Amino acid sequence: MNLEAFVLGSGGMMPLPNRHLTSVLLRREGDLFLFDCGEGTQVSLRRLNLRWKKISVIFVSHTHADHVTGLPGLLMLSSQVDRDDPLYIIGPPRIAEYIETSRRVLDMYI
């Protein structure tokens, strides 16, 4: 089994030009798993040429801003394209409220 880890962001509070907020992607035999989704996650995915459409699960450790502020943008992008498989989000109970509020405020169709 081949497992690769990509640190997409490791900063806190405020993203810097070369250091985005918390996010790690694991790739295992073509499957992609995202752990946290801080601001700048989409930029890092693009810079590393990682196929964000292949992310099958997003795990959210907790709902501090530096771990979730990239989620609305990634979900909005995901809602605009055809996905081969569903996207699952696993996290603490309040993550559902955060996603629903973001969906409503940003008028997302997810």
Please give the residue ranges for each predicted region.
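Binuclear metal-dependent hydrolase catalytic cores
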Residues: 1-110
